[in-house]
């Protein structure tokens, strides 16, 4: 997941991403129909539930060449990459988002001059309003949950939810949002296009709390009686996000970074020895492991050490920070070279198109075009052989590697944990993951959400936590689809 890529974020309006129209691959092999699923983790039957979810087609990905097309084994891959935030580093989400909300709301009041009546209300009062991957409709002051066909399946104006008739009055009788449809049809070309002034999806837990900041600010404006034809709240929220995640603040000890560094255990789960042992077992089998994170190395080191231990770098053959996904998977090696950084001075020494697999060398930025060559040089296989990438950001970690490279993907979707029990779920699952206001992340009223559709078509396996994988041997055959079971509507 990306984090604290300040210059890049300004250039790209804080990583505004336009979703592609998901293609129905000819390689779709398996249809998962989840009805009265018994979820089994290890040897224990942990949970059982009845679901109404419609057929969910999972692909084996375009590059799938396994003889076991309906299963995934980590042992079948030559190289395996991991995202860091919300993948290997597991955050205490309620605490993290409370911190983010409080700082962003304070910025809106103290810097932008908005009334404090709603903004400084406790985050906990409306925590059920926050859900990952909501769309912000800037001009209308609305938040939108989008269906797989681009239909508005739920929407709010400020924090007030719209009735079905209000949704039709706003978005048309078919409830099809014009900007949402444009967003779906136009993939990354629209990242920096005109739609960036109108629409934004809140793709991760670092910007998800901004939905409530935006909504409460709209409430404030409406209460004043001076309702605008077009709202202009989002640019102020965006300024607050940029300010909060400015990496220069890491060394200055201010704000967000000061809170994280001074009490990392409040926001990050401690070392998970099962995951560490699992990573080591992959390396012992000769797999080349790479860590690819959008976070800056200074911040990444703090949270990685807390989650993976002081020798965390040795778990990987190469560590790359400030990766600037999704462009990492798209650009060529000449366009986006790797930067080698001298420690401890942090001086950028030189640019290299192709890095070396050395966990003690610090790399920033770069491209898949360069990394695949390095992986191939290390294991003697073209492009590194068969490659798997594991991450949580649906666009940066799931869609882009499949669309633009020959990688296959495993999606980490923590929202699954709201519906089922899995290894470690008693410690890892936050109560907010099942939104009391928006309902299931995966569907509403029996209609599959757009994000659920993207996950099903671009990931080979979708799990609630890396723990669900680490609890099994590396040659365990995971059935393609949701594991340990399908989430309900």
Where in this protein do the model-derived segments appear?
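HAD-like aspartate-dependent phosphatase fold
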Residues: 2-4, 20-489
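Cleavable N-terminal signal peptides of Sec/SRP-targeted secreted and luminal proteins
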Residues: 8-11
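Cationic, low-complexity basic patches in intrinsically disordered or flexible, solvent-exposed regions
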Residues: 14, 19
């Amino acid at each position: 997941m990306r984090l604290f890529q300040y210059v890049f974020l300004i250039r790209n309006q804080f990583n505004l991403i336009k979703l592609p129209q998901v293609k129905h691959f000819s390689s779709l092999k398996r249809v998962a129909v989840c009805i009265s699923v018994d979820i089994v983790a290890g040897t224990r039957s942990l949970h059982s539930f009845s679901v109404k979810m419609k057929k969910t087609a999972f692909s084996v990905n375009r590059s799938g060449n396994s003889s076991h097309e309906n299963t995934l084994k980590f042992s079948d891959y030559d190289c395996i990459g991991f995202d860091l935030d919300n993948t290997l580093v597991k955050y205490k989400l309620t605490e993290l988002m409370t911190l983010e909300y409080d700082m962003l709301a304070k910025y809106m009041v103290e810097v932008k001059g908005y009334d404090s009546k709603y903004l400084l209300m406790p985050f906990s009062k409306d925590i059920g309003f926050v859900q990952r991957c909501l769309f912000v409709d800037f001009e209308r002051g609305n938040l939108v949950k989008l269906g797989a066909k681009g239909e508005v399946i739920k929407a709010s104006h400020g924090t007030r939810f719209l009735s079905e008739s209000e949704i039709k009055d706003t978005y048309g009788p078919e409830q099809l949002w014009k900007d949402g449809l444009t967003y779906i049809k136009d993939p990354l070309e629209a990242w920096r296009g005109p739609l960036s002034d109108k629409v934004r999806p809140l793709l991760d837990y670092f910007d998800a709390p901004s939905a409530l900041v935006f909504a409460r600010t709209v409430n404030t404006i409406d209460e004043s009686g001076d309702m605008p034809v077009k709202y202009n709240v989002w640019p102020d929220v965006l300024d607050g996000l940029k300010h909060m995640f400015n990496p220069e603040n890491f060394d200055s000890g201010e704000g967000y970074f000061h809170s994280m560094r001074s009490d990392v255990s409040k926001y990050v789960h401690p070392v998970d020895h099962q995951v560490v042992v699992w990573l080591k077992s992959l390396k012992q089998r000769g797999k080349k492991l790479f860590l690819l994170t959008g976070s800056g190395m200074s911040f990444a080191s703090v949270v990685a050490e807390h989650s993976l231990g002081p020798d965390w770098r040795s778990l990987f053959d190469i560590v790359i920070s400030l990766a600037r996904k999704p462009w990492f998977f798209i650009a060529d090696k000449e366009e986006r070279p790797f930067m080698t950084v001298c420690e401890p001075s942090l001086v950028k020494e030189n640019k290299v198109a192709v890095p070396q697999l050395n966990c003690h060398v610090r790399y920033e930025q770069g491209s898949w075009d360069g990394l695949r060559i390095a992986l191939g040089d290390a294991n003697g296989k073209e492009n590194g052989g068969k490659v798997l990438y594991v991450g949580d950001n649906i666009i940066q970690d799931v869609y882009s590697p499949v669309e633009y490279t020959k990688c296959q993907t495993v999606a980490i979707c923590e929202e699954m944990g709201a519906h089922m029990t899995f290894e470690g779920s008693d410690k890892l699952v936050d109560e907010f993951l099942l939104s009391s206001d928006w309902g299931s992340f995966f569907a509403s009223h029996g209609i599959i959400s757009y994000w659920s559709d993207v996950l099903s078509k671009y990931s080979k396996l979708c799990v609630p936590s890396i723990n669900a994988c680490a609890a099994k041997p590396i040659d365990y055959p995971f059935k393609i689809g949701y594991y340990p079971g399908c989430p309900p509507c």
